């Protein structure tokens, strides 16, 4: 393991859940930002028909 020394500073019982929680929070924030700033993604999730390009 390349970064094995991190577990000398942080216990795995603390570090692993902390890392996984950070990944989940980042994912939710990114998905929320994309859903609120785009118009096509919510429509795609709702299953509406695609608009033909002009």
From Swiss-Prot:
TM ranges: 15-35
Molecular function per GO: bacteriochlorophyll binding; electron transporter, transferring electrons within the cyclic electron transport pathway of photosynthesis activity; metal ion binding
Keywords annotated in UniProt: Antenna complex, Bacteriochlorophyll, Cell inner membrane, Cell membrane, Chlorophyll, Chromophore, Light-harvesting polypeptide, Magnesium, Membrane, Metal-binding, Transmembrane, Transmembrane helix
Membrane-side (Cytoplasmic) residue stretches: 1-14
InterPro entries the UniProt entry points to: Antenna_a/b (IPR000066), Antenna_alpha (IPR018332), Antenna_alpha_CS (IPR002361), Light-harvesting_complex (IPR035889)
PROSITE patterns registered for this protein in UniProt: ANTENNA_COMP_ALPHA
Stretches assigned to the Periplasmic side: 36-54
Highest taxon listed in the record's lineage: Bacteria
Any GO CC annotation of this UniProt entry: organelle inner membrane
Disulfide bonds: none
Keyword Heme: no
Pfam families, A to Z: LHC
GO biological process: photosynthesis, light reaction
Compartment(s): Cell inner membrane
Binding site for a bacteriochlorophyll: 31
Protein's membrane topology: Single-pass type II membrane protein
Subunit and partners: The core complex is formed by different alpha and beta chains, binding bacteriochlorophyll molecules, and arranged most probably in tetrameric structures disposed around the reaction center. The non-pigmented gamma chains may constitute additional components.
Similarity comment: Belongs to the antenna complex alpha subunit family.
Function: Antenna complexes are light-harvesting systems, which transfer the excitation energy to the reaction centers.
Name recorded for this polypeptide: Light-harvesting protein B-800/850 alpha chain
Species for this entry: Cereibacter sphaeroides (Rhodobacter sphaeroides)
Gene name in the database record: pucA
């Amino acid at each position: 393991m390349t970064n094995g020394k991190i577990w000398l500073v942080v216990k795995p019982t603390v570090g692993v859940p902390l890392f996984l929680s950070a990944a989940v929070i980042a994912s939710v924030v990114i998905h929320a930002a994309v859903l609120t700033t785009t118009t096509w993604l919510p429509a795609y999730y709702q299953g509406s028909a695609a608009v033909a390009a002009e």
